[in-house]
């Protein structure tokens, strides 16, 4: 997720973590870089979650193995920091070491409350950030170019993140549960999108709705903005900030045969509970699905 700020942010397993704590170092294979140019303009109702799911569908779950996915282009430039976090968060689902966006004015504006004592101005911070940009003559293992002007909301099927289809091809699929949250889509921007769709509506009687804000700070902000109230009035259960159902713990674990529409990042077999099926999607699609009880394009409500 931190790749959205221009950082090299790679996850490690427990063994590497223990070595890092004890020795102060971690061993990494030097990754190559795959540049992903995103052109065009996203349609209303299409989000960064749809973008990264589409990219994973094109690359496959092993397509970025031992590589950093460097996201660039007009679509990335127009994204908020939180949207970029979603983009980078799921780079690993294509096998990538991490995802990264070059820091720009959006980055400086977002970080300014935290770094204003270190720089004379945002312009000075931005100038400092530029040293971390890729060189004009940088070598890439691969350069991908996508025009996403016609991209539709994406939904996963089967048990791999690269199994994705436009929402229209999955519309009408029954779900037992809708889960909104996780490190992928539990930020305030995500909760606002879902709450806007849910406001004044109630979820289907056949659906359990579970929402888990990503952090205590986000929970408090959602509470202050009235978002938590909207979720509760619509029929959602609001949990404490947690990884929760994403990895089959806490509230929202699936029973065998149950189906969940989820804003999380992984749909592996048994991930959310033995015998359960997980369909990945954006918060907007998840909210619409909760209302109807079947996978639904939010733009049709």
Where are these regions (language model features)?
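Fe-S-dependent hydro-lyases/dehydratases of central metabolism
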Residues: 1-301
């Amino acid at each position: 997720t931190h790749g959205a700020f221009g950082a090299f942010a790679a996850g490690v397993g427990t063994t590497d973590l223990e070595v890092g704590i004890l020795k102060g170092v971690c061993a990494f294979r030097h990754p190559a870089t795959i540049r992903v140019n995103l052109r065009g303009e996203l349609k209303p109702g299409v989000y960064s979650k749809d973008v990264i799911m589409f990219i994973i569908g094109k690359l496959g779950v092993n397509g970025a193995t031992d590589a950093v996915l460097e996201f660039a282009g007009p679509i990335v430039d127009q994204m908020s920091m939180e949207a970029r976090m979603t983009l980078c968060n799921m780079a690993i689902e294509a096998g990538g070491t991490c995802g990264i966006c070059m820091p720009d004015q959006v980055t400086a504006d977002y970080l300014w409350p935290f770094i204003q004592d270190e720089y004379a101005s945002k312009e000075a911070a931005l100038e400092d950030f530029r040293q971390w940009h890729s060189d004009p003559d940088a070598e890439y293992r691969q350069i991908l170019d996508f025009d996403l002007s016609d991209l539709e909301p994406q939904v996963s099927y089967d048990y791999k993140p690269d199994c994705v289809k436009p929402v229209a091809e999955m519309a009408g699929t029954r779900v037992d549960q809708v889960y909104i949250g996780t490190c992928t889509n539990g930020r305030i921007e995500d909760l606002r999108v879902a709450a806007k769709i849910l406001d004044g509506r109630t979820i289907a009687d056949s659906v359990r709705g579970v929402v888990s804000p990503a952090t205590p700070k986000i929970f408090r902000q959602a509470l202050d903005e009235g978002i938590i109230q909207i979720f509760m009035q619509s029929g959602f259960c609001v949990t404490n900030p947690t990884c929760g159902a994403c990895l089959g713990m806490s509230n929202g674990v699936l029973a065998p045969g149950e189906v969940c529409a989820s804003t999380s990042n992984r749909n592996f077999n048994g991930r959310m509970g033995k015998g359960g099926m997980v369909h990945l999607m954006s918060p907007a699609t998840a909210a619409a699905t909760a209302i109807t009880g079947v996978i639904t394009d939010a733009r049709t409500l």
